[in-house]
Amino acid sequence: MDTKIIVNHALRALLYEVTVNPKPGLVDPLSAGPHPDMNAFMFIDSALSLAPYFNACAAAGVAYTAVDLTGLFKQIRGIGVQAEQTMFAATKGVNTHKGAVFSLGVLVTAAAYQLQHPDVDLATIVRTMLAGLTANDFNDLNTKDPTTLTAGERQYLTYGIKGIRGEAEAGYPTVMQVALPALRRSRGTINQRLLDTLMAIVQATVDTNLVKRAHDPHVIDWVHDQAHRYFDLGGSRSEAGMAFLRELNQIFVDHNYSLGGSADLLILTIFIGLQTDILA
């Protein structure tokens, strides 16, 4: 494997995620969900605009020789800010992949670094790269102007939810311990397998995008129950399970709910699945 393959897998992960359908509360080819300003074509444009960014991440990872891997993260974080602007230019200001710019950029960098250090597992590389991330990012939030806080910062202050920063700093345990095993167990078409993997993620995670939309952390208990029901109905390989997803999407549209955090974790899962031939 080389960096070109890693970048290819990153782009495929973004494109696979938007193609999977029907996804409740998310954009797919059949529905924009609660995102009237988005469509699948916009996600394709957004994904392809990020190719130079992933190439830069991979190049940084494979060339990095210093012992302190937090320096590698600092390198790509600056590149990521530029990539966000490229994405916004491609989508005319719509936030399609900002979460993936961070999370998938980290994984692409770690996977490229691993090419030179095959004895170190991916999660360990990520944890070492991101050591101290939440402490650094959330330090002194109480002294900041509340109007300048991001949604993630507000949720941390209000509910103590660390969100994607906490997930990333821990080496993406939801991906490694929940989503990838679910993908390995899954059967059927790629679409069926990825739907079941998505709902396994939904069942296990605190989706900060959903909390943001609902303005209530208790919505997480509700969505976990919905994911349980989906699997009780037979999941993606049953007519009842698929009908339930379509009904659930309408509920999400009616309440303006989104599962953007879960979608980002699915992207990471697809990427690793392609890297490891779980998705052939």
Swiss-Prot record:
Enzyme class: transferase
Keywords, comma-separated and alphabetical: ATP-binding, Nucleotide-binding, Transferase
Reaction equations catalysed: 3'-dephospho-CoA + ATP = 2'-(5''-triphospho-alpha-D-ribosyl)-3'-dephospho-CoA + adenine
Enzyme Commission no: 2.4.2.52
Pfam entry (one): CitG
One GO-annotated biological process of the protein: prosthetic group biosynthetic process
GO MF assignments: ATP binding; triphosphoribosyl-dephospho-CoA synthase activity
InterPro entries: CitG, TriPribosyl-deP-CoA_syn_CitG
Membership in a protein family: Belongs to the CitG/MdcB family.
Full protein name: Probable 2-(5''-triphosphoribosyl)-3'-dephosphocoenzyme-A synthase
Annotated organism of origin: Lactiplantibacillus plantarum (strain ATCC BAA-793 / NCIMB 8826 / WCFS1) (Lactobacillus plantarum)
